[in-house]
């Protein structure tokens, strides 16, 4: 039976992970985070700051890992330096809902790219969150503008590399899905967008084919049993609330 590891998290969160690769016992190292929510203000280190400042502080901690030794706890790589990560993962909610006082997804995506591209040398893998897909799924108030696809289109362009890049105007929420995978050191890493719905699960089955041996690590923003407010209304005008 294929080994499947599902990484599902909510809230702002960061952790580093080490795992023994299937090939020659090599140790894989990656950093995972989610829900950076550019555009919000929150209390951080005793004062109210923008989430972009929090993200830059988090990115600074990534660099500290290169010289940080793993705990002497008999775990994988115990006592050795973490070193440079093989890759970094962020599972969405890069932008935030456009309530009054919160910046647009256009500005948030620009800030994210500026901060992360200048700080990370390892490959960066992304999937969108619910706030990227509609910019405000689950938010009951009227938004202005109703939608801003900047972060959704940006993630799609980076990860899917279409022949023609999507723009805010051309991005299609129904068809422009983010899903991809790669195998590294005998482990398959699979990225299934915001939520592993029927479409994503069908793609997953096609992607792995008859491979029942390679271990799988799965990244998605929402768990299979997801919050219904994160989805479009199937009735009426098919609005986001």
Where are these regions (language model features)?
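Bacterial N-terminal signal peptides
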Residues: 7-16
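Short, solvent-exposed loop/turn segments at secondary-structure junctions
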Residues: 36-38, 94-95, 131-133, 195-197, ...
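His/acidic metal-ligating clusters that form di-metal
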Residues: 60-87, 172-176, 183, 188-241
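Extended active-site neighborhood of metal-dependent phosphoesterases/phosphodiesterases
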Residues: 98-205, 210-215
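N-terminal active-site segment of His-dependent metallophosphoesterases
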Residues: 17-103
